[in-house]
Amino acid sequence: MEALVYTFLLIGTLGIIFFAIFFREPPRIVR
């Protein structure tokens, strides 16, 4: 069960960092 918790924390941290960088800079992807 600890592996699942560590994986969840890792994904959560990466997700927070990704959203922080994504919302800090204006999205340059034009569809």
UniProtKB/Swiss-Prot annotation:
Record membrane topology: Single-pass membrane protein
Cellular component terms per the entry's GO annotation: chloroplast thylakoid membrane; photosystem II reaction center
Entry keyword annotation includes Transferase: no
Tree of life domain: Eukaryota
Keywords: Chloroplast, Membrane, Photosynthesis, Photosystem II, Plastid, Thylakoid, Transmembrane, Transmembrane helix
Transmembrane regions listed in the UniProt entry: 3-23
Main localization category: plastid
InterPro entries in the record: PSII_PsbT, PSII_PsbT_sf
Gene Ontology terms describing biological process: photosynthesis
Subcellular location as annotated: Plastid, Chloroplast thylakoid membrane
PANTHER family listed in its UniProt record: PHOTOSYSTEM II REACTION CENTER PROTEIN T, PTHR36411
Described function: Found at the monomer-monomer interface of the photosystem II (PS II) dimer, plays a role in assembly and dimerization of PSII. PSII is a light-driven water plastoquinone oxidoreductase, using light energy to abstract electrons from H(2)O, generating a proton gradient subsequently used for ATP formation.
Protein family per UniProt: Belongs to the PsbT family.
Subunit annotation: PSII is composed of 1 copy each of membrane proteins PsbA, PsbB, PsbC, PsbD, PsbE, PsbF, PsbH, PsbI, PsbJ, PsbK, PsbL, PsbM, PsbT, PsbY, PsbZ, Psb30/Ycf12, at least 3 peripheral proteins of the oxygen-evolving complex and a large number of cofactors. It forms dimeric complexes.
Protein's name according to its UniProt entry: Photosystem II reaction center protein T
Species: Stigeoclonium helveticum (Green alga)
Name of encoding gene: psbT
